[in-house]
Amino acid sequence: MGYRKLTEVELSNKSVLLRLDLNAPIENGFVTNKERIYRSIPTITHIINKDCSLILMSHLGRPEENNEFQPKYSLKPVVKVLEEILDREIPLYSLEELEKLNQKPTISILENSRFYVGEKDNDVGLSNRLSDLADIFVMDAFATSHRAHASTTGVIRFSKEACAGLLLDEELTALTKVKKNADHSIAILGGAKISTLSLIHISEPTRRTV
């Protein structure tokens, strides 16, 4: 599979829009599982160490797509965790606020991408607005890379440069190795839904490994 890697892109003095998967579970305003956030850190630190401005972007949950702020689905709890890990302040902006900034901070984050009308429909207008936020688009949200949304695929069409982040590259490399070295059919199951267990039991008589 051919794609451009983050390590192959010149980042110095550029602005970067980084699509992550920060869709972490939240209860009473606190993140209860930080794994996805921690897995995003290597790509974030790689970029901010290159003397450039960085905008983080992610979805959270399934809010109504109506261009309005919905507190239940705000990325604020996620931002708090990121600030603790990176030991720096990370301002949270709406798309409109980011578009009005004359000079963007070293690092900032766009509020929940699913707040905006056109995200799930891969709207051309929204995709274009997102691409205008930065010089380079970096896709590092492996868990949502199968979705043709404005913030995952649409933005790539209009970006000056686009590449795969460190996590996405790691996952794709692992999948390629499995596929290349397999001598029989392979089924890869993902997710944490109990309903998938029945499928595993059904396939048990014919499988070699789960």
Regions found by a protein language model. Name each.
Residues 1-203, 207:
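Active-site loop-to-helix "anion-binding N-cap" substructures in soluble metabolic enzymes
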